[in-house]
Regions:
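A conserved active-site-flanking secondary-structure segment within enzyme catalytic domains
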Residues: 337-394, 398
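Flexible phosphate-sensing "switch/lid" loops adjacent to ATP/NTP-binding sites
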Residues: 1-325, 342, 370-371, 382-510
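Catalytic nucleophile serine of serine hydrolases
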Residues: 330
Length: 510
């Protein structure tokens, strides 16, 4: 049975996910078989495993850091918000329904055995399991039936490290307050504190470190600096998509729809010199981009209505008609078509059949069905028309997560793909406009831009349209780049945390 170590935070965005990923990398480098675990994740960014199970992307990143394949055992419960008060509940990789917060908390206790089983199965296969908590362990209003923070630590018999964010101020109050709100037996399980996102001279901090250790009896096991590392992190979502990006030679605008999902589909463009990737929410912010991307969403028709009401749909149509490239992924792809039929009234919660007119940029029609399609895919681009013709024949891979079936003229298909882990036939997928400006494309495949050379070909085509070219542009090996970033993170963990002490905590247990 594996030894377990739990990472909790004083608050959301304290850096739990990144610290967990870094420790996974260090343990892996030191020769241990290590796996991440988070009993319950709330996120719109998800991933499909080789078995077709849906899980949170944060644990996928941590699995990559640990040099192992992601498994739904690492995240048995995923909550995907569909509205301000409701979420789709996914258990062991499969959706079991959409629930209001009260409904979920009323049945949450029934999921504890599923969490225990997933953890025990995972622990039987590895030397170390790094468990990540959620939010704060001191949320006393939702402590009943907890299996996410200290409740999970008890289930796993795991010593706990508490991560605190100093960048936002009030770090000592947050450490002390968190520990004091824990029950005595829970507080005894916290064996160390990590101060995260520090800027400046750590010597100035030392008197405070000594005082907080004296007041709490819990040692500080390290101070991590504000680290510039490019690792996909659930906690960094708000910073990534709200930060202002300087407009460069090529300007790509991602429409930040209210229920945007899988924003990580576009990270690869940030690695290409001369490209700005902006997330926009208004016509004013949209400006004059070279390409507009409409991303995936957890509520296609709701977000399409938002596009209409905000004036963004009219702006996108105007851009498309003037020749700007428009690319839709998953829900964004569905929006580009003629209409979206919801025979069960699932998305609007009415339970009544309804049809929502699409944007009419692609000759496709989508009908929602009850069963979600979750599968890894591989294939290649077909005969791509227009500005992105250089993509024709290039291999692609990724995964699908959607509840709709889309009909389209096969001669307008964008790709031909088949399931990676099943004996499935090759099928036409995606669509493009083959008349007029030849500048609108759509696909269900998440990760479509990550394939070798695909993002670069797109940027080269956008440059050529402007009569420019980028000299000595390098094809990006996204996988190798991510490996380098994990190593940078591990180096910082080793340099700034007392790994000898952490190994002692791990060995001693609770």
């Amino acid at each position: 049975m594996a030894k377990a170590l739990m990472i909790v935070g004083t608050m959301s965005n304290a850096g739990k996910s990144l610290v967990t990923a870094g420790l996974c990398r260090v343990f892996n480098q030191d020769g241990y078989k290590v796996a991440p675990f988070k009993s319950q994740n709330m996120a719109l960014n998800s991933f499909i495993t080789a078995e077709g199970a849906e899980m949170g992307r944060a644990q996928v990143v941590q699995a990559e850091a640990a040099n192992i394949e992601p498994s739904v055992l690492m995240n048995p419960i995923l909550l995907k918000p569909t509205s301000d008060s409701g979420s789709q509940v996914i258990v062991n990789g499969e959706a079991i329904g959409t629930m209001k917060a009260g409904e979920y908390y009323a049945m949450k206790h029934t999921l504890r055995p599923e969490v225990q089983k997933a953890f025990d199965t995972l622990a039987s296969k590895f030397d170390i399991v790094c468990i990540e908590g959620a939010g704060s362990p001191a949320e006393i209003n939702i402590k009943k039936d907890d299996f996410v923070n200290m409740g999970m630590a008890k289930m796993a018999k795991a010593p706990v490290l508490l991560v605190a964010d100093i960048d936002r101020g009030g770090v000592f109050a947050s450490i002390y307050g968190t520990l004091m709100l824990l029950e005595d037996d829970e507080r005894a399980m916290v064996k160390g504190v990590i101060i995260n996102k520090f800027r400046g001279d750590v010597e100035i901090l030392r008197p405070g470190l000594k005082m907080i250790e004296e007041k709490t009896g819990v040692p500080i096991v390290g101070v991590l600096p504000m680290l510039k590392v490019d690792i996909e992190d659930e906690d960094s979502l708000s910073e990534r998509i709200s930060g202002r990006s300087e407009v460069k030679l090529i300007d790509i605008a991602v429409v930040r729809i209210p229920r945007m999902s899988n924003y990580t589909d576009f990270n690869v463009f940030e690695l290409i010199p001369g490209v700005s990737l902006r997330y926009v929410t208004s016509v004013r912010e949209l400006g004059q981009p070279d390409m507009i991307i409409i991303p995936g969403t957890k509520n296609t028709t709701g977000d399409l209505k938002w596009l209409r009401q905000s004036g963004m749909e009219a702006a996108i149509l105007k851009h498309a008609n003037s020749g700007t490239v428009v690319f839709g992924v998953c829900g964004g792809y569905q929006m580009l078509g003629k209409q979206i039929s919801d025979p069960y009234g699932e998305e609007d919660g009415t339970g009544k059949a309804n049809i929502t007119p699409g944007m009419g940029l692609l000759e496709i029609e989508t009908t929602f069905i009850e069963k979600k399609r979750t599968i890894q895919m591989a294939g290649k681009f077909g005969q791509v028309q227009g500005i992105f013709s250089a993509l024709s024949g290039l291999p692609l891979y990724g995964y699908e997560i959607h509840s709709g079936v889309t009909e389209f003229p096969e001669e307008k298909a964008l790709t031909s793909i088949s399931p990676i882990h099943e004996n499935g036939e090759i099928m036409a997928e995606g669509s493009q406009n083959t008349e007029g400006k030849l500048n609108v494309y759509g696909t269900y495949v998440h990760g479509v831009f990550d394939g070798d050379g695909i993002a670069v070909k797109i940027v080269e085509a956008l440059l050529a349209k402007k009569g420019k070219k980028m000299e000595d542009i390098q094809t990006i090996n996204f996988a190798e780049y991510k490996r380098q970033q994990y190593d940078i993170l591990a180096d910082s963990i080793r340099e700034n945390l007392d790994m000898k002490k952490i190994y002692e905590i791990l060995e001693a247990g609770v």
